[in-house]
Amino acid sequence: MSQFHELTIKKVSKDTDKAVIISFNVPQNLDEIFAFKAGQYITLKTKIAGKEIRRDYSLCVSPKSNELKVAIKKVENGLFSVYANTLLKANDVLEVAPPKGRFVFEPIKSTARIIVGFATGSGITPIMSIIKTVLEEEPLSK
């Protein structure tokens, strides 16, 4: 079972009319714990109306960005997604578990390959992380 850490929200930005991007401040002493590979996700935990809620969200930035960001699409009647899109703001605190997941991309700098990714809807978020990683770390790939 993952250990959760309290992280402060750095910024909540409206990405579309139905989605926000949440950026977290990661204290320096937790940098190693929150290091991730492109394609991984984090689990967010909070209490809403007295009930503990956990949701997994893919990271949507490259590991080299030194940022921890997730995109959350508002889902009708989605308890956490509605909360995130309407109430969360900078300086709020959420409990966050370290990155997990096996849908990862490991770049090879000297490789030249053609990479194609398909995704729809909010499934684009891990692909965004992978695309950014390819562009930053595999300069010979397309």
Language-model features: locations:
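Ferredoxin-reductase
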Residues: 2-92, 97, 113
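FNR/FR-type flavoprotein reductase catalytic core
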Residues: 82-142
